Each structure stands twice: as C-alpha cells, then as structure tokens.
C-alpha cells in the first residue's frame, strides 16, 4: 500500500505539468493482478490533488459499483474492463441511472442469449468461423455465467467447432430454461 501512496503523491506533486489532459487510475497494483479488492481511496487521493479529470477503474461490475465509485472517489468518469465481459449492457444501465436515478433491471435470459448470438455472428463476420467460434467460447461463458445449468452448456459449447452448432446449442439452452420457468 505504501508504494501506491508514494506513487500517487508523485503524480499529484507534479500536477501533471507534462501536458496530460486526463489520467486513468486503477485501484490495484500490477502485482495484485485480479486478486484482492481495488483500492478506490487511491483514486480519491489523486482526484483531490490534481486539476485534470480523473478516470477511476477497478471492481466495477454492477450499476451500484459505479455509483459507489463515483461517490467514494469523486472521479470524473469510470473505466470498465472485466465488468463488461458478458455484460455489455452495463454501460446503458449506468448511463440510464446517471440520467434518471433509476436502475434498470438485469437483462433477461433472452437478451443475454440473443446478445451472445449477435456477438458470435459479428465475430464470425470479422474473423471467420474457425477463429471466431474458438475465441467466442470464453465470451459465451461470460454471457451464461450465473444462469441455470450453464456449466453443462459451456462445456458442450467448448467442444463445438461450427457457428451453426453454437447457435443451435444456445437456442436449445434458452428453450430448455424457458420451459423450466
């Protein structure tokens, strides 16, 4: 923690005279990687000591996380990384809250599956079927995370090699889930 604080005071003391117009601060060190909790206090410290916009980053996975980061750090903007994996609507949900004060509901099962299928289709158009189907396996796993019986479906999709088979598996999974509701 001391290294972080020393680094922040160095940044703050220079007041970024080198022409930087904004700075993004992640509340976690490289050594921490994804472990532990992001230290939003460091973002707040930088914000309090510089005159340029500060972009906060780290541990924003839900609308509530974004609200808490803004309130705790007073940062000017938020950058989202892993929180958008399998969750691209997080940006719309945060923007909606910022404009209305209302938190939109989580996307439905159908929205998640249809978004995964659209993402897969775009990936195939961009990279070709062979590469896209393989690269999309991890993305589809993120879309399905937390859904009923998703571990089985993820395992099955990880063995599929064609676009059409992945789409069929996603559609049959969605129908199975809707039948159980």
Predicted region positions:
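Single conserved hydrophobic/aromatic residue that forms the stacking wall/gate
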Residues: 1-11
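Glycine-rich, proline-tolerant flexible connector loops at the mouths of alpha/beta enzymes
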Residues: 25-35
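Alpha/beta catalytic cores of nucleotide-metabolism and tRNA/nucleoside-modifying enzymes
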Residues: 9-22, 34, 41, 45-56, ...
């Amino acid at each position: 923690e001391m290294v972080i604080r020393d680094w922040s005071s160095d940044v703050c003391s220079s007041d970024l005279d080198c022409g930087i117009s904004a700075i993004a601060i992640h509340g976690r060190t490289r050594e921490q990687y994804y472990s532990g909790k992001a230290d939003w206090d460091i973002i707040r410290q930088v914000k309090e000591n510089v005159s340029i916009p500060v972009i906060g980053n780290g541990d924003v996975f839900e609308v509530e996380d974004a609200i808490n980061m803004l309130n705790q750090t007073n940062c000017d903007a938020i950058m989202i990384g892993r929180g958008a994996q399998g969750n691209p609507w997080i940006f719309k949900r945060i923007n909606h809250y910022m404009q209305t004060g209302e938190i939109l509901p989580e996307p439905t099962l159908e929205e998640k599956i249809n978004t995964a299928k659209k993402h897969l289709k775009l990936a195939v158009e961009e990279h070709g079927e062979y590469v896209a189907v393989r690269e999309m396996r991890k993305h589809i796993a993120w879309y399905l995370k937390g859904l009923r019986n998703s571990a089985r479906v993820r395992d099955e999709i990880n063995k599929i090699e064609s676009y059409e088979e992945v789409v069929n598996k996603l559609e049959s999974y969605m129908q199975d889930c809707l039948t159980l509701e």
